Amino acid sequence: MAERTYRINIAAELAGVRVELIRAWERRYGVLTPRRTPAGYRAYTDRDVAVLKQLKRLTDEGVAISEAAKLLPQLMEGLEAEVAGRGASQDARPHAETWRESMLAATQAYDQPRVSDVLDEVLAALPPLKAFDEVLAPLLCDVGERWESGTLTVAQEHLVSQMVRARLVSLLHAAPLGRHRHGVLACFPEEEHEMGLLGAALRLRHLGVRVTLLGQRVPAEDLGRAVLALRPDFVGLSTVASRSAEDFEDTLTRLRQALPRGLPVWVGGAAARSHQAVCERLAVHVFQGEEDWDRLAGT
């Protein structure tokens, strides 16, 4: 399996270190020598991120970066031992539920560093799709339910969701690009919830589908222009926020009319499942489960 890599902005967010500081540390003290992508971007590995975290910890404790850089050989030895130990103790790793409970407790306490640490542990222990299916997606559902019930605040919900989003984006950067079929993915025009869309993009990438991800709040007219230019094999839409049948039908009709006739259109999310009859009437497929992934991938 290819080693996961991150662009510098993602590595900075994962490590809690400013991009400018990473560049300065590299230039002045040679703390890292990241590989370069064919496009010339720095590509940081999980080990690089771990080194940055250790350097941040030392400097936060008052150690000068010049002195911390001298400790890199010992830091690297410790990281190698940690990786080896992790491989030898995979059977003893926490269950997905334990990870989720740890992150929920950290969210309740506004402990974002703890959320970050557990997320890193999850992604180091599990393959990307397994991590999403067993930990990240259920975690987001739990967080959403607790926000709706009033046991989590908006600030707490944002605290964890932005961390999960950063990890999903990093997994997408590292995922295979896909070669045969091409899908364009977008949220409904007023839809701000994009985690499900990111998860769909990740799975389709791993199924060999080339994905163009347009993200949140995509106007129907703009989606139509993009699709005309890209000529994909299908369009995937996501809609989570609750809406009336009339509003849902009006929005989906505008989206359908903006797209070429005959182009397969799929829609997923809680709102879509609530209005399946509308989708059927407009000849739009409602995503239901595992078999539909194979249909989208053409397998």
UniProtKB/Swiss-Prot annotation:
Whether Translocase counts among this entry's keywords is no
The HTH merR-type domain extends over: 5-74
- Comment field on protein domains: The N-terminal region interacts with DNA and CarS, and the C-terminal region is involved in oligomerization and binding of cobalamin.
One GO molecular function term of this record is: metal ion binding
What protein does this entry describe? HTH-type transcriptional repressor CarH
- SMART domains reported in the protein's UniProt record: HTH_MERR (SM00422)
Q: Which residues bind DNA?
A: 8-27
How is this protein activated or inhibited? Requires cobalamin (vitamin B12) for repressor activity. In the dark, binding of cobalamin to CarH induces its oligomerization, which enhances binding to the DNA and repressor activity. Light causes cobalamin photolysis and disruption of the cobalamin-CarH complex, which decreases interaction with DNA and allows transcription of the carB operon. Interaction with CarS also prevents binding to DNA.
Say what the protein does: Negative regulator of the carB operon in the dark. Binds specifically to the CarA operator, in the region around the carB promoter, which blocks access to the RNA polymerase.
Gene this chain is encoded by: carH
A biological process term (GO) from this entry: carotenoid biosynthetic process
The cross-references to CDD domains, in alphabetical order and at most eight, read: B12-binding_like, HTH_MlrA-CarA
Q: What is the lineage of its organism?
A: Bacteria, Pseudomonadati, Myxococcota, Myxococcia, Myxococcales
Quaternary assembly: Forms oligomers. Interacts with CarS.
Q: Which residues form the B12-binding domain?
A: 180-299
Name the family: Belongs to the CarA/CarH B12-binding photoregulator family.
InterPro entries from the xrefs?
Answer: Cbl-bd_cap, Cobalamin-bd, Cobalamin-bd_sf, DNA-bd_dom_put_sf, MerR-type_HTH_dom, MerR_fam, Meth_synthase_dom
Q: Which UniProt keywords apply?
A: Carotenoid biosynthesis, DNA-binding, Repressor, Transcription, Transcription regulation
Q: Name one Pfam family in it.
A: MerR_1
